[in-house]
Design a protein with these regions (language model features):
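Hydrolase active-site cap/lid region
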Residues: 296-343, 398, 406-409
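Short beta-strand elements
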Residues: 110-130
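C-terminal catalytic histidine-bearing segment of alpha/beta-hydrolase fold enzymes
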Residues: 342, 377, 384-426
Length: 426
């Protein structure tokens, strides 16, 4: 039996933590003939392919390849036998804005190795396909008004075993709508004075939180949130059972009703987190949002729904441009409309109120954004289109070869940006 090793593949931990995936002993290297991996509509892509074995040339390999538009079915397949350890894949072109992906496969000594390379066509012209409801703002104004009747009832438990000489760590909770609570781990600098704060939102899944001690050491309060209304300091097996049971596919729960959809409670609870942070005597009231994937969703949504947010970091946000699939191109995670059976009037109506591209259109706080061309979880067609419609001051970090992960240097840059932005607010 052949084993498959996907270069730049994602384990669940890589997805959550943003870690760079491992490489196999055989490397397939794909290099576009444009140095920036960007093309104009109609230009041809010639992709150089090289193979290495333990860092040395692997000569004469047969490379099978597929070419597709972002997350679409392949429209071209072929193979090339390398001369020495190099060859060229003629990938073709696109006639419209978007991303073109080459998937290359090599079999060697009973193992199968896979790598992807993606290039952009007129990417700055991409815009979301999803429709913004005429009552979008009115809908969310009504939902936010429900928080006015909710007493915060904050609770904090000092986690002495996690505290350091410079940072206190707490397991916290506060009330949300319908009698639910939101939970998280709060890290607070011990020094005198008041500090800015960051709401840090999680990627998809179910699990515990450890608290962001490292960035609290840099002089910011960090509230690392959970979204499921359960404590975030329980035994790991509890989250495993929930993740494989009742929460196995929560992103589509109650998608037929915008006021009962799973993320309704989550979005409102995220906004309520601002009130929690501002209630802390150590907080100076300057708050930013930070997150990737599902966390990028919540970072943008919270910033859009509450003007108290002063800076926003979102990397490869999920839930962008759900209707892409209905319009013949990639849609956002969780890809609910890839399944044609889900394309009902009720589901589409609800999804529009929760589409991140619709929230992005109204952002006001400065934004630092990141996405990768090789991301097959939160497709670049969706994240790039969403970035393009942000009207706020913005900057983007592009990862031409990254998937659903980041390099450490990129994550450091995101944190340096938001800490600098928050500390500069007078």
């Amino acid at each position: 039996m052949k084993k498959t090793i996907i270069a730049l593949a994602l384990s669940f931990m890589a997805l959550v933590m943003g870690a760079q995936p491992r490489q196999g002993k055989v490397q397939i290297i794909l290099v576009p003939d444009h140095a920036d991996a960007l093309y104009k509509a109609g230009e041809q892509v010639n992709m150089k392919v090289m193979t290495l074995h333990c860092g040395l040339p692997l000569d004469g390999a047969t490379v099978k390849y597929e070419v597709s538009e972002d997350l679409m079915e392949p429209h071209k397949k072929g193979e090339v036998t390398l001369k020495g350890n190099e060859g060229v894949i003629k990938a073709g072109s696109m006639k419209k804005p978007g991303f073109l992906r080459v998937k290359a496969t090599v079999e060697h000594e009973g193992e199968r190795y896979i790598v992807r390379s993606t290039v952009g066509f007129d990417k700055d012209k991409l815009v979301p396909t999803s429709v913004m409801p005429e009552d979008f703002d009115a809908f969310w104004k009504r939902q936010l008004s429900k928080l006015e009747k909710v007493k915060l009832d904050p609770k904090m438990e000092l986690l002495e075993e996690r505290c350091t000489d410079e940072v206190d760590v707490y397991h916290i909770s506060y009330r949300n709508i319908k009698g639910s609570r939101m939970y998280g781990v709060l890290t607070v600098p011990k020094g005198e004075g008041k500090y800015p704060a960051v709401l840090r939102f999680p990627g998809a899944g179910v699990g515990p939180k450890g608290g962001d001690i490292a960035h609290a050491h840099k002089g910011v309060i960090v509230l690392e949130m959970g979204i499921h209304g359960i404590p975030v300091n329980l035994e790991g097996s509890i989250y495993d059972d929930l993740g494989s049971g009742i929460l196995s596919w929560y992103p589509e729960d109650n998608l037929n009703d915008p006021e009962k959809y799973y993320y309704h409670r989550v979005f409102l609870g995220a906004v309520q987190g601002i009130d929690f942070l501002q209630s802390l005597p150590q907080c100076n009231g300057v708050i930013g949002t930070f997150g990737g994937s599902q966390g990028g969703t919540l970072s943008i949504v919270t910033s859009r729904l509450d003007s108290r947010i002063k800076a926003t970091v979102a990397y490869f946000p999920a839930m962008c441009d759900h209707e892409g699939y209905i319009n013949g191109r990639a849609g956002g995670w969780p890809h609910m409309f890839k399944n044609e059976a889900n394309r009902t009037e009720e589901y589409i109506r609800t999804a529009r109120y929760y589409d991140v591209s619709n929230f992005a259109r109204g952002l006001q706080a400065p934004v630092c954004y990141l996405y990768g061309y090789n991301d097959i979880t939160c497709a670049p067609t969706t994240t790039c289109a969403t970035y393009n419609v942000i009207p706020a001051p913005k900057q983007v970090i592009i990862g031409e070869n990254i998937g659903h992960w980041t390099y450490p240097e990129q994550m450091n840059a995101l944190w340096d940006w938001i800490i600098g932005e928050l500390k500069s607010v007078k």
